[in-house]
Amino acid sequence: MGLLLAVSISCSDDDNDDNTPPVPTVDVMIKETTLGKVLTDGSGKTLYFFTKDVAGTSACTGGCLTVWPVFSVASPRLNAGLNAADFSTITRADGQKQATYKGWPLYYYKDDTAAGDVKGENVNGVWFVAKTDYTMMLGNAQLVGNDGKSYKSDYTEGTADTQFLVDSLGRTLYAFINDKKNVNKYTKADFSNDDFWPIYYADIKSLPSTIDKSLFAVIDVFGKKQLTYKGWPLYYFGPDSKTRGMTKGVSVPRPGVWPIVNKESPNAPD
């Protein structure tokens, strides 16, 4: 009788173990996928960035949320290697809380059914897996110049979203129309004008899958490194005040002199 009871208890315990999924001990972790290391929730489901959120607020509303549900864990428990200072929470226009990473709101993709799925990558050219080591990201937004006017991608006045390169924190990068291939024609030797158009440099690590790493190079500018894209030296615009999504530089001193950069940018001239 004792033996039968022991066997019964053992079987019961085994059944519970088989049917009860493990409880995640963290809310966010880094997981290896076919796209490299990406941010996931505690069960391994991939998290995503939306390029239209470049200003730090969510542009995904209505039916978009059915396809891209928000990741709403506030003060998430983090796996080793993640920095709590990189995470925050925003309150969406619909009142819902949404977690952010380095200012980018985080989402799931409805068609990702298994841990490590990355089916949402490059959907419509505006959704990308969330990574900790992006050197650059892409933003989609209305270009608004320092003159307060709205511009299209050809720098004529008008309303239309344009896609452009930003740093990992969503800050816009620019080219200078007078520069040559991998030659900075703007910055003075004493860097006295660097505050207005600061040169940009960062080690190239991860990039969105639509951006070709081979199109970047590093040049020397009076002893400082500067990153180039398609031969164009890259700059910030000082009056953007290091603010996400600002594009004030596109109208200075007139539209087209300091353009944003993207895949459609021509190669810099020799």
Give the role of each language-model region:
Residues 56, 88-139, 233-267:
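Hydrophobic, ordered structural segments
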Residues 32-33, 76-96, 113-115, 158, ...:
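A cross-kingdom feature marking solvent-exposed beta-strand/loop segments within repeated
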Residues 57-88, 125-131, 181-216, 256-268:
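A low-complexity, Ser/Thr/Gly/Pro-enriched, surface-exposed linker/loop concept
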Residues 39-42, 92, 98-102, 165-168, ...:
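Extracellular/periplasmic catalytic domains that process cell-envelope and extracellular macromolecules
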Residues 2-30:
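Bacterial Sec-dependent N-terminal signal peptides
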Residues 39-40, 45-48, 106-107, 165, ...:
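Short, structured motif recognition centered on aromatic/hydrophobic residues
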Residues 28-69:
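Post-signal-peptide N-terminal segment of Sec-exported extracytoplasmic proteins
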Residues 22-38, 141-164:
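N-terminal edge beta-strand
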